[in-house]
């Protein structure tokens, strides 16, 4: 699929700074005809076709209706080359990250399946479909100020300076190849825990007054420590943590009617090397719940203006070569069933769910979610830099640290 998206009448200059950050990352490898951070979501479904219609026919009409309801899904792909023949009843959504985030993807699919689950083929007539209002950018939805306020600008500069220093300098996994090795194919390695194991993790976290995400985060930190030297470990482990900002937005932007937009921020917590498992997880749980502030929301215009400027600035000609970052970003989708219900009347149910993104750098992303009471950990990476053996070993160590830290026995399915 072509990686460049052309929206008639909407040049790059009409994207907000926040949206341009995601757009810039998406297009970073366009010279190789590859897209970075392209979202893919795969759902296996079981369905009884209404009125004898085929699944593909009904799906096509349901998608047309969804596009009318969510105008942000409309696009003209440039360089569309691949076709995916239907082998089984799986629904695959490919979409750009600057257009939607992980939870928004779940919300869109939930609405698509809701349409599909109806007893009659859904109407696509414009006069019978009520489109949602266009969704503004994150900055606008949050009510951020564009005023040249010295305090807001100072807050924004401090936030971005700290973010870049902590995110860029963080150590990560050892990768194969060197700084000139081009990316290849996106891959993933998943661990699907049993229902009993998932419940054991949740019970242990509840007992220790920590979140499941914080426990996974701590296990990930200890896994990365296991690949570093003793000296490298002393700085602790800092990773970029994706944060869902939808609960912080005012109505109506915190609703499913505004699913087709990216509402995500990033924080950079540090896990100290010498702290205990539960101690680290409690500290992370507290940071997850306390980092947000009204000043952050009010400063968003300036935060992403400075962020975009730093990302776009050329490196000084005399600067020493920078080691490509190879950190592991953590992103928790939480309980997917809250946004993708899984059951849609007697005609349709979603049996399996998987989410991921295309990765073109040496960085990797660990996604965590529960669906139908099972916890899944999915490591997304590029196979030019990591073998499947390496990915499997990383995930095995994460699971092992979860077992030891929470004192539970875990089984995968």
From Swiss-Prot:
Reported induction: Expression is positively regulated by the azaterrilone A cluster-specific transcription factor tazR.
Record has Transcription as a keyword: yes
Polar residues composition-biased segments: 123-138
Signal peptide residue numbers: none
Region (Disordered): 123-145
The keyword Transcription regulation appears for this protein: yes
Keywords: Transcription, Transcription regulation
Pathway note: Secondary metabolite biosynthesis
Function: Part of the gene cluster that mediates the biosynthesis of azaterrilone A and other azaphilones, a class of fungal metabolites characterized by a highly oxygenated pyrano-quinone bicyclic core and exhibiting a broad range of bioactivities. The first step of the pathway begins with the non-reducing polyketide synthase tazA that assembles one acetyl-CoA starter unit, five malonyl-CoA units, and catalyzes a series of Claisen condensations, methylation, PT-mediated cyclization, and finally releases the first hexaketide precursor through the R-domain.
The protein's name in its UniProt record: Azaphilone biosynthesis cluster protein M
Originating organism: Aspergillus terreus (strain NIH 2624 / FGSC A1156)
Lineage: Eukaryota, Fungi, Dikarya, Ascomycota, Pezizomycotina
Recorded name of the encoding gene: tazM
């Amino acid at each position: 699929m072509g990686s460049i998206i052309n929206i008639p009448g909407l040049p790059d200059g009409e994207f907000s700074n926040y949206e341009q950050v995601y757009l810039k990352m998406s297009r970073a490898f366009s010279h190789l005809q590859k897209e970075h951070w392209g979202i893919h979501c795969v759902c296996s479904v079981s369905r009884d076709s209404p009125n004898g219609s085929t699944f593909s026919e009904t799906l096509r009409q349901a998608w047309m209706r969804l596009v009318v309801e969510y105008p942000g899904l409309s696009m003209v792909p440039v360089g569309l080359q691949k076709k995916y023949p239907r082998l089984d009843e799986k629904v695959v959504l490919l979409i750009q990250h600057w257009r939607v985030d992980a939870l928004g993807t779940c919300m869109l699919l939930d609405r698509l399946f809701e349409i599909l689950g109806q007893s009659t083929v859904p109407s696509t007539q414009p006069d019978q479909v009520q489109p949602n209002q266009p969704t503004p950018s994150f900055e606008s939805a949050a009510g951020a100020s564009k005023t040249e306020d010295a305090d807001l600008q100072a807050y924004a500069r401090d936030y971005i300076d700290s973010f870049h220093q902590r995110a860029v300098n963080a150590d990560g996994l050892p990768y194969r190849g060197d700084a000139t090795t081009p990316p290849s194919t996106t891959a993933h390695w998943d661990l699907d825990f049993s229902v009993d194991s998932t419940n054991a993790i949740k019970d242990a976290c509840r007992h220790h007054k920590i979140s499941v995400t914080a426990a996974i985060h701590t296990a990930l930190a200890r896994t990365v420590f296991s690949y570093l030297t003793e000296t490298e470990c002393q700085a602790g482990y800092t990773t970029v943590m994706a944060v869902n900002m939808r609960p912080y937005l005012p109505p109506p932007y915190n609703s499913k009617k505004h699913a087709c937009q990216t509402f995500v921020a990033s924080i950079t917590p540090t896990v100290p090397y010498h702290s205990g498992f539960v101690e680290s997880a409690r500290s992370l749980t507290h940071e997850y719940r306390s980092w947000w502030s009204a000043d952050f929301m009010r400063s968003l215009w300036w935060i992403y203006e400075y962020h975009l400027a730093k990302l776009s600035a050329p490196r000084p000609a005399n600067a020493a070569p920078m080691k490509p970052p190879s950190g592991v970003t953590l992103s928790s989708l939480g309980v997917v069933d809250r946004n993708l219900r899984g059951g849609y009347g007697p005609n349709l149910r979603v049996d399996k769910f998987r989410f991921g993104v295309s990765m073109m750098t040496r960085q990797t992303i660990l996604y965590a979610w529960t669906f139908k009471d099972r916890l899944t950990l999915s490591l997304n990476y590029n196979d030019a830099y990591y073998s499947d053996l390496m990915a499997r070993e990383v995930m095995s160590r994460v699971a092992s640290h979860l077992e030891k830290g929470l004192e539970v026995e875990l089984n995968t399915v």
